[in-house]
Amino acid sequence: MSSLVTLNNGLKMPLVGLGCWKIDKKVCANQIYEAIKLGYRLFDGACDYGNEKEVGEGIRKAISEGLVSRKDIFVVSKLWNNFHHPDHVKLALKKTLSDMGLDYLDLYYIHFPIAFKYVPFEEKYPPGFYTGADDEKKGHITEAHVPIIDTYRALEECVDEGLIKSIGVSNFQGSLIQDLLRGCRIKPVALQIEHHPYLTQEHLVEFCKLHDIQVVAYSSFGPQSFIEMDLQLAKTTPTLFENDVIKKVSQNHPGSTTSQVLLRWATQRGIAVIPKSSKKERLLGNLEIEKKFTLTEQELKDISALNANIRFNDPWTWLDGKFPTFA
């Protein structure tokens, strides 16, 4: 099993977990179940991934068979953009809990600091970037005029009610987090961001350390996940798996792979990772990186020096320049 980090509310979270993004619903429940058997205890999901029923099914199966208890599993989900209004926050959370068949979440993120028009579950769920049939015909997205602090305070009420244990933010920049800290009652425990050697975001990571906010990395392998989504930038960016620096570091540690080096570069710097894999040997390899090898300070610096500020998951790019999340 992965080592644990202690969040600012005292809750302990595994440093290595399984990301549920793009796990096909047909195999998802079994993958979650098998991952638990291998030792995984952190599962990072989201309403937008469209597989929460299956994630919950895999978790509940493992619990029912006595492999784990609920308190052994750290379950994560995310509030989607269409449900930012305080009237809809708890509604969306309860939908997630109902789909997963669970009573509470260990961590619930605001997925993006972007508020869309509300879409009822019966109209489309998960709604993705849909804000109504008329908007869809026009290729338009209607925003909702909801300040992020209003959404956050609704989440604080969910903590009070025991529906979630922790609040996190995802895809937020430092200035927005700083503003949130000025007005929140319950501090966010984690920030989930795109983080890999092409996008190290060192100032943001340092800011989080100063404020005792755990950084969680997604897309640890850089362009790899986005090539499958036909993103042009990802297709034209050299893969990190074949990068000379990463390959050299891997060769310095016999038995390690380039993907494991990328993950170890993060965890050794205190950043949690949530890679996805369907192969047992890779799942085990990812889980065991902390025991397997330790990078030298120079290797950490050499990998960090690859930073090129290349961001693949940017709404500005794929939503026609209308949402300046990272501007």
UniProtKB/Swiss-Prot annotation:
Residues the record lists as binding NADP(+): 219-286
Keywords of this entry: Cytoplasm, NADP, Nucleus, Oxidoreductase, Stress response
Residues the record marks as active site: 49 (proton donor)
Cell compartments where the protein resides: Cytoplasm; Nucleus
Residues reported in the UniProt entry to bind substrate: 111
A single GO BP: arabinose catabolic process
Protein name, UniProt field: NADPH-dependent aldose reductase GRE3
